[in-house]
Amino acid sequence: MQKSLLAIAMASLLTPISYLHAQEVQTNDTVVVTANRFEQVESSVLASISVVTKAEIEQLNVTTALDILKTLPGVEVNSQGGKGQISSIFLRGTSSKHTLVLVDGVKINSATAGGASLGLIPAFAIEQIEVVRGPRAAIYGSDAIGGVIHIKTIPANRQTKHDANLGYGNDDHSSLAWRSSGQLNDSTQASFVFSDEKSDGYRVNEVAPSGDSHGYQSQTLFGSLRHEIDDAWSVQFNGYQLSSDVEYANQFSGVKNESNTDFYSIAGSLNFHKDNYSSQLMVSRSDNESWDGVASGMVAKTALFSSRNSVSWLNHWVVVPALTLAAGVDYDQENARQGGANATNYSKTEKDNKAAYVTAHFSKNIVTAEASIRSDDDSAFGKHNTWNLGLGIAPSDYVEFIASTGTGFKAPTFNDLYWPSSGNPNLKPETSKSSEVGIRSYLPFVQIDISAYRNEIEDMIDWAPTGPGGAWTPSNIDNAKIEGIEIEALFETGVIEHRVSAEWKDPRDKSDDSFLIRRARENFSWVSTYSADRFGFSAVANYVGDRKDSTGKTMDAYTLLDISANYKMTEALTLGARVGNLFDKEYQTAHSSGGKYYVGEGRNWFATVNYRF
């Protein structure tokens, strides 16, 4: 990448800011847990991290987790159509399966495909989102080559409150939701969220007949119960359930198909905290059942069933005020099988992984440092070790210099290893080496984070023939190098708050120097919000650069503008409205093997009524 790139990027952000009145930006030291699997304030985290709070989500009036994520630096969301359709999250240009996704501490990545589905998680249910960019495999193991996304639905405070929410929009888009949380007694607190949503949708692929639409319906449940046994011991239970029916177009024929999914996860933990030591033993289980096929008629659908059983024991010691140690062990057992119209099953239906890790965090005076090491033992490919090092130097209260380096890996999925007649049980894990340098500046009128990163991924799994004229099978054939620069700036102009993020990246396939598919080289986001006693307004502009697809076609760059407003009629009743794609921009999100484009949604609107008591 050109050396002038960073200078140009900094100039583009700093030039308008120099004319602002010097007013202090409030930097809230939010408590986070995702970066190192223990609680710490956000400013002490050396990894690049973004945190979105409940208040910020409500200001934007968005409906899904993906709407929130696409405004953050380093996050690119690609959907094959509208809400509920297949979506990919490219964290710093890595594949969707390279991002670990947690919901209330429980992994929801698919055991069969590797990625995670976030398109139907309602924003109404979310209390906080933490996004850690850069590899965290030395702490979490497989799936965290690109980073970690942690969605939290359990409120941190104990205030009793209830929310009833109704929404309606174009394409007969409707939602009904309820949220309750608070104290059941002096030692027990609980939370509950229910959401029911449906829409007729729109024509998501040009191959579909004119007049077709592809809708969805979903029901979502979240729940938690925490009981404090005494001052040191507590137990917690939490769960997540999703049932959905999503229509989509067959990429070759255009015939309307339907995907029916039932997913649930449940977790229980025993927690101990006394003085400088804390420990958590968590047991969880998740199950996923999906059926795919023609939406109408008598044709049988194919089915996939998968489950994951997990046990984690985490320990955290504050040795001295400057030094924190953490260590833990993880065990995961995954199962998968096929059914319905699938005539044959996976060649193997079970695999497991055992792991142990240790991490240390040191902070004193101007120096912050961290180190982590982890060893995984996978039944499919054996042992694999990963590590991570980070260093921060803060010569003043206004600036901190950060550098980090580490390794990661992605284990082959069930589909890669054991798919009937084409799985490859000899696959190795994909591996990565990454490095990052950054500057965090806390000036009186602006907060700026600048990061430059490089991630090299080897033994990437892709389809290839076993030999001349041979059968095609997943193989360790690809290598990739992704370099990029991220900038995020927080500042105020009068009563309006701004969050501007920009990313320039160079995601390349090292075998032929081509660009990785569906990744833009430039992404920009500008979020502006205004809040008064009763009225709030927000505007979100997103620019996505041009992208190439596997078919060789290029999707043009596009810019979308979304606006929203809230009006608090009483202390309890709030009205909200949002218009997405305000200027009705036509754009493509992918090019299918059938020769047609997946298209994004045109101008759309959604209005809500929320009653809180």
UniProtKB/Swiss-Prot annotation:
Motif residue range(s): TonB C-terminal box: 591-613
GO molecular-function term, one example from the UniProt record: porin activity
Annotated ranges, domain TBDR plug: 41-154
A Pfam family annotated for this UniProt entry: Plug
Membrane topology: Multi-pass membrane protein
Subcellular location(s) per record: Cell outer membrane
Gene3D superfamilies xref list: TonB-dependent receptor, beta-barrel domain (2.40.170.20), TonB-dependent receptor, plug domain (2.170.130.10)
Signal peptide span: 1-22
PROSITE patterns: TONB_DEPENDENT_REC_1, TONB_DEPENDENT_REC_3
GO-annotated biological processes: monoatomic ion transport
Keyword Transmembrane attributed: yes
GO cellular component, one term: pore complex
Domain TBDR beta-barrel, residue spans: 159-613
InterPro entries cross-referenced by the UniProt entry: B12_transptr_BtuB, Plug_dom, Plug_dom_sf, TonB-dep_rcpt-like, TonB-dep_rcpt_b-brl, TonB_box_CS, TonB_rcpt_b-brl_sf
Placement of sequence motif TonB box: 29-36
Principal cellular location given in the protein's record: membrane
Keywords of the record: Cell outer membrane, Ion transport, Membrane, Porin, Signal, TonB box, Transmembrane, Transmembrane beta strand, Transport
Keyword Transferase in record: no
Role according to the record: Involved in the active translocation of vitamin B12 (cyanocobalamin) across the outer membrane to the periplasmic space. It derives its energy for transport by interacting with the trans-periplasmic membrane protein TonB.
PANTHER family xrefs: COLICIN I RECEPTOR-RELATED, TONB-DEPENDENT OUTER MEMBRANE RECEPTOR
Family: Belongs to the TonB-dependent receptor family. BtuB (TC 1.B.14.3.1) subfamily.
The protein's name in its UniProt record: Vitamin B12 transporter BtuB
Organism whose genome encodes this protein: Vibrio vulnificus (strain YJ016)
Native organism taxonomy: Bacteria, Pseudomonadati, Pseudomonadota, Gammaproteobacteria, Vibrionales
Gene name, Swiss-Prot/TrEMBL: btuB
